[in-house]
């Protein structure tokens, strides 16, 4: 991912609002060493407890209260990492609640065909789950032999 002015501005905003050292940010956004710098930047972002009111707790990096913005950055990074392969990215995201539409938008729309079946499958699974009776409801109890 080339660090465009917009990206630098966004990260600078995060730096000022979330107390990430701007000097570190400036060093990381300088030319060269792209991927490594990006990884450091993500590391700094996710270690910073102020993003989305302290994450963790839910499921790895994006668990708990991570903001949608942090998730979007992470998704974008995953998409880049896997050669714009949304399947690989979504597999890695697992149940991280990333909106598939966000994923489509972030991948520039080219991956629409690959993503739609995944969305359909997710929606079907959610419907199945919501229709399942709670454990211990009548008729679902296992009787000892």
From Swiss-Prot:
Signal sequence, start to end: 1-19
Keywords noted in UniProt: Secreted, Signal
Cellular localization per UniProt: Secreted
Tissues in which the protein is found: Component of the acid-insoluble and acid-soluble organic matrix of calcified layers of the shell (at protein level).
GO cellular component, one term: extracellular region
Main localization category: secreted
Protein name as it appears in the record: Glycine-rich protein
Record organism: Lottia gigantea
């Amino acid at each position: 991912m080339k660090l465009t002015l917009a990206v630098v501005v966004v990260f600078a905003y995060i730096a000022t609002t979330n107390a990430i050292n701007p000097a570190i940010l400036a060093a990381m956004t300088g030319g060269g060493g792209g991927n490594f710098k990006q990884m450091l930047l993500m590391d700094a972002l996710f270690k910073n407890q102020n993003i989305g009111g302290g994450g963790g707790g839910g499921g790895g990096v994006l668990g708990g209260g991570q903001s949608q913005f942090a998730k979007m950055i992470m998704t974008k990074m995953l998409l880049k990492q896997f050669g714009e392969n949304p399947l690989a990215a979504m597999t890695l995201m697992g149940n991280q609640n990333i909106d598939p539409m966000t994923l489509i938008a972030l991948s520039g729309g080219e991956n629409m065909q690959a993503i739609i079946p995944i969305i359909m499958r997710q929606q079907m699974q959610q419907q199945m789950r919501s229709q399942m009776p709670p454990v211990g409801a009548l008729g679902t109890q296992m009787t000892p032999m």
